[in-house]
């Protein structure tokens, strides 16, 4: 598969650490379905965990039983054998395993003014007793505009300098290695209208 081989090279060579950005990653009908059925913050706030302090302001939902059937099937797909084999070939990391609990991941929502300071994710998954190696982010807000800000930023390995700035456009996917130096975040508060929210589904491996 020349496409995958080419992208594996791109992944390994990208700075500040191995990562890649894919456009129109999911079939459009599936991306639209997931976006339209994304857990509603107003109706299901009681299911979301809330992080709201100086470092982060966002909602996240790890419990897949609270998802619609379509999003449950999607969450199963991102943990499937075929997707794991794709990730292993792309990243060069062998024997990847999914996190079926979506600890620190799952469905995430950032409202107007929300942010996430530059950080590194915890690398040790206590529940699975395994090291995290890779993170996949699926951006799922239809008609997201550049002026809404809320970009994903990848910073240098010493955490002192921004290197990449990625707009969370609809059906864009970002994959990157999870290490003790993979600094990233969304430090710029979202400027979206109150009726628009930044949706991202996060999976760790």
Where are these regions (language model features)?
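A structural signal for well-ordered alpha-helical scaffolds and beta->alpha junctions
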Residues: 27, 71, 80-84, 88, ...
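Non-heme Fe(II) oxygenase catalytic core, chiefly the N-lobe of the double-stranded beta-helix
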Residues: 36-39, 66, 75-132
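A structural signal for short, well-ordered beta-strand segments and their strand-loop junctions
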Residues: 21, 97-100, 106, 175-176, ...
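Catalytic core of Fe(II)/2-oxoglutarate
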Residues: 113, 121-134, 141-205
């Amino acid at each position: 598969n020349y496409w995958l081989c080419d992208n594996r090279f791109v992944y390994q060579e990208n700075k500040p650490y191995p990562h890649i950005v894919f456009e129109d990653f999911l079939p459009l009908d599936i991306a639209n379905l997931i976006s339209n059925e994304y857990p509603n913050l107003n109706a299901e706030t009681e299911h979301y965990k809330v992080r709201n302090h100086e470092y982060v302001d966002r909602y996240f939902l790890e419990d897949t039983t609270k998802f619609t059937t379509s999003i449950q099937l999607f969450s199963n797909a991102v943990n499937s054998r075929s997707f794991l084999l794709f990730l292993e070939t792309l990243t060069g990391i062998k024997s990847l395993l999914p996190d079926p609990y979506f600890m620190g991941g799952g469905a995430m929502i950032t409202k107007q003014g929300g942010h996430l300071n530059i950080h590194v994710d915890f690398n040790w998954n206590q529940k699975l007793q395994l090291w995290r190696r890779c993170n996949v982010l699926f951006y799922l807000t239809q008609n997201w505009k550049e002026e809404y800000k809320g970009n994903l930023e990848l910073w240098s390995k010493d955490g002192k300098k921004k290197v990449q700035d990625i707009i969370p456009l609809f059906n864009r996917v970002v994959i990157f290695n999870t290490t003790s130096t993979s600094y990233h975040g969304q430090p710029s508060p979202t400027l979206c209208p109150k009726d628009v929210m930044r949706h991202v589904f996060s999976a760790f491996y």
